[in-house]
Amino acid sequence: MTFLPLLFIFFFLTSIPFPAFSQYNDRSTLLNLKRDLGDPLSLRLWNDTSSPCNWPRITCTAGNVTEINFQNQNFTGTVPTTICNFPNLKSLNLSFNYFAGEFPTVLYNCTKLQYLDLSQNLFNGSLPDDINRLAPKLKYLDLAANSFAGDIPKNIGRISKLKVLNLYMSEYDGTFPSEIGDLSELEELQLALNDKFTPVKLPTEFGKLKKLKYMWLEEMNLIGEISAVVFENMTDLKHVDLSVNNLTGRIPDVLFGLKNLTELYLFANDLTGEIPKSISAKNLVHLDLSANNLNGSIPESIGNLTNLELLYLFVNELTGEIPRAIGKLPELKELKLFTNKLTGEIPAEIGFISKLERFEVSENQLTGKLPENLCHGGKLQSVIVYSNNLTGEIPESLGDCETLSSVLLQNNGFSGSVTISNNTRSNNNFTGKIPSFICELHSLILLDLSTNKFNGSIPRCIANLSTLEVLNLGKNHLSGSIPENISTSVKSIDIGHNQLAGKLPRSLVRISSLEVLNVESNKINDTFPFWLDSMQQLQVLVLRSNAFHGSINQNGFSKLRIIDISGNHFNGTLPLDFFVNWTAMFSLGKIEDQYMGTNYMRTNYYSDSIVVMIKGIALEMVRILNTFTTIDFSGNKFEGEIPRSVGLLKELHVLNLSNNGFTGHIPSSMGNLIELESLDVSQNKLSGEIPPELGKLSYLAYMNFSQNQFVGLVPGGTQFQTQPCSSFADNPRLFGLSLERVCVDIHKKTPQQSEMPEPEEDEEEVMNWTAAAIGSIPGISIGLTMGYILVSYKPEWLMNSGRNKRRIKPI
């Protein structure tokens, strides 16, 4: 009686399709995996009532789960042990998550894997020596952008079916194995951005990778010469990047003989010799040999690279002329040859055929005229040709070029006049009015016309430059008033050293992003702009040498680090709590040193600069450290006591209150100014004793107490003993050991002693100075500059050596 029911059950079960069983098993396993992952919301559609082959992030083949894609799911913890409980799993992507811990050897159980991506996680520790226990048919292995350390194990070379191996951007601090060369099927190798690798030559064993198409070995501490043996059999190679290493010697000819090569990056090494003359890699699109020590001439054969879009040869020792054939490259977009020793004229053909976007040949010895057709293709964005021997007129076509955002022409020999767009005349001295065509450059980010001889008023149409971040019109002959409605995107305004009059426009208060405002040495007649205290980003305020007047009774500049209101007509007393809100000078906290202005435009093309009085000398600070702080109230008519709240400014470096009418004592709270380097309170009506607390300020190298009414002992301490006599002059009731040692010319009653020589000033460690008494060096005309234009040009390559960090978190 039991035989027939059993037989019925057997036939029933065998009649059910096998994929249905497989899906049932996989569904159960997937639900367990979901549980192990903490039941994330992104897997909410996984349930026990639907087929797993219809679930998101799951792919099936013939009813079997063959692919799991958990990319960018914000998963945390360790990789679940259930991840390999799918007998037909071929592809597993766990990238862009927060999985942590050591390499998950549980993946050894995924025996049919062909694709494994663990990149962009938090894995650490060393890769296991037996990593070759991964699936024998594995073709794609990506472990990049984790925190793996130590050596890359030799056995990685035994995963014999690999076509792609990505190990870039981790913390490896050992070696990478030459056994990688045993991966005969490998097509893509990325070991880049691992600068902690032990220095090593490029292994000749890599020459066995005959199927390799993509080689990215940037910034991984490679040394020695590039061996031709490595590349002579890589006939399929399309991309080679060996940049930012310490490679030496000549560039092997074999690299320029790779007929499938489209991109070659060798920049920022120590390569020498000439560029190979024969170039048969006719498919090259990008060629970057910049920042080496290459010499000789630019090969004429580069003119045969008809697919070339980018040619970077800057910062080398190249000589000779620019080959005319380069001007005939039909696809050329970027030509950067700056900082070499190139001579001759710029080929007139450049820009006429191609859709040229960037043309940079500054700091050479080029002569002749600028080509007329640079913007013929209608795509030109930058023309940077400063510091050459160029002459003639500036082409009208530059004025008509609507896409142009960057022009640097200074330090050349341009002459004559030029009509630009609206008959505005300018020449190499750049006199006359500011051309209004500038206002039509709607993508303009930085406008620097400083140190010229422009006259007339500032064009009101500047208000139309909605993307402008830097406006520098300083050191010209501009007159009239400051325009209203300057772009609210501006971060830095420098209109100092002109003849501007009137008042500061109240519309400035709308520029909430403003960090620097410099209007020094004009004829502005206004009261103190207390209304600027609502600008939460304002760090530098320079009003010196104008006709500002009135009292200053309120101040709430929380971010202010540099304020110079010297040489005006301010008066009245300063409240005792005047400095209470200047919190940026209380403590800078832990911030990284950088120069102001280098964050503008998302590049490092520009740095703010100002003139400050320090140690009694006017100095031009060509770059401003974000940790530098100074207060200069000198040359006004302030009265009353110095506010005690000045002692709160523990990060203050320079304090100048000289040439006012301050009375009373120097507040002892100044002894709290532990970073103070320069103190000038001369030419006031201060009385009492000099606070002994000042003698404990170890950085205080310069002090000036002259022309006051101080009495009593001068404090001891090295700082006081090394000051010149002039620092204490015209205080007849001062006396003490310090004066007896160095100031016998003032105090005749002290024993005759030899005057101590004035010590040389220590080199400033926190500032990069161009020191000069103001007016002692004639200004240098730097020319008409637009777009990414700067006082001290810093090539982009120096700031963006990591340009090949291609992998970013997906949206």
Swiss-Prot record:
The LRR repeat ranges on this chain: 62-86, 87-110, 112-134, 135-159, 161-183, 184-208, 211-233, 234-258, 260-281, 282-305, 307-329, 330-354, 356-377, 379-401, 403-427, 441-465, 466-489, 491-511, 512-537, 539-557, 558-581, 625-649, 650-673, 674-697, 699-722
Glycosylation sites: 47, 64, 74, 93, 109, 124, 233, 246, 260, 295, 304, 389, 422, 429, 455, 464, 485, 525, 571, 581, 656, 704
Disruption phenotype: Enhanced susceptibility to pathogen powdery mildew E.cichoracearum.
Membrane-spanning segments: 771-791
Signal peptide range: 1-22
Stretches assigned to the Cytoplasmic side: 792-811
Protein name: Receptor-like protein 52
The species this protein was found in: Arabidopsis thaliana (Mouse-ear cress)
Lineage: Eukaryota, Viridiplantae, Streptophyta, Embryophyta, Tracheophyta
